[in-house]
């Protein structure tokens, strides 16, 4: 089974039936999923924002959120010092750099809908292929 690191943007699309849901389902199929522990908080915050924007959908949103546990995502500890260094290098938030750090540490594909995070991941992969970059966090 292939390891993949999944970020909150991808999980929110998956749980809340967003337009990109099918794309995410295809990318995650058959994978062993991993994420930093902050994933749960980010997804819960997205659920809260959706409830505030659409109070009439509260119950449906809570039911969708409750299916997060069924996804069997391994929540991993992050080396915060290395994630901070990576955030500074890539100009990402520490939150986003945590996903990027984990993908590097596990040598796993990063599944995200966040354009800035995806660009940083691509740039790091390209640099590591050329032997001049950050190939692994470990």
Residue ranges and their predicted role:
Residues 52-66, 116-123:
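Membrane-interacting alpha-helical segments
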Residues 70-116:
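Active-site neighborhoods of divalent-metal-dependent phosphate/nucleic-acid chemistry enzymes
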Residues 1-3, 36, 100-138:
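Acidic, PIN/NYN-like endoribonuclease modules and their adjacent C-terminal/linker elements
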Residues 24-29, 65-67, 82-85:
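Glycine/charged-rich beta-loop-alpha catalytic/anionic-binding loops adjacent to active sites
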Residues 1-38, 50-62:
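Short, well-structured N-terminal submotif of metal-dependent ribonuclease cores
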């Amino acid at each position: 089974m292939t390891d993949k690191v999944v970020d909150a943007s991808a999980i929110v699309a998956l749980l809340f039936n967003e337009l990109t849901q099918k794309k995410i389902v295809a990318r995650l199929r058959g994978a062993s999923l991993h994420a930093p522990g902050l994933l749960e908080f980010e997804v819960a915050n997205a659920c809260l924002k959706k409830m505030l924007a659409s109070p009439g959908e509260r119950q449906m949103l809570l039911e969708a959120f409750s299916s997060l546990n069924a996804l069997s995502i391994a929540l991993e500890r992050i080396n915060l010092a290395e994630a901070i260094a990576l955030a500074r290098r890539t100009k990402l938030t520490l939150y986003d750099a945590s996903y990027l750090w984990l993908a590097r540490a596990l040598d796993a594909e990063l599944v995200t809908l966040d354009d800035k995070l995806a660009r940083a991941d691509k740039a790091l992969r390209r640099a590591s292929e050329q032997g001049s970059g950050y190939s692994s966090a470990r």
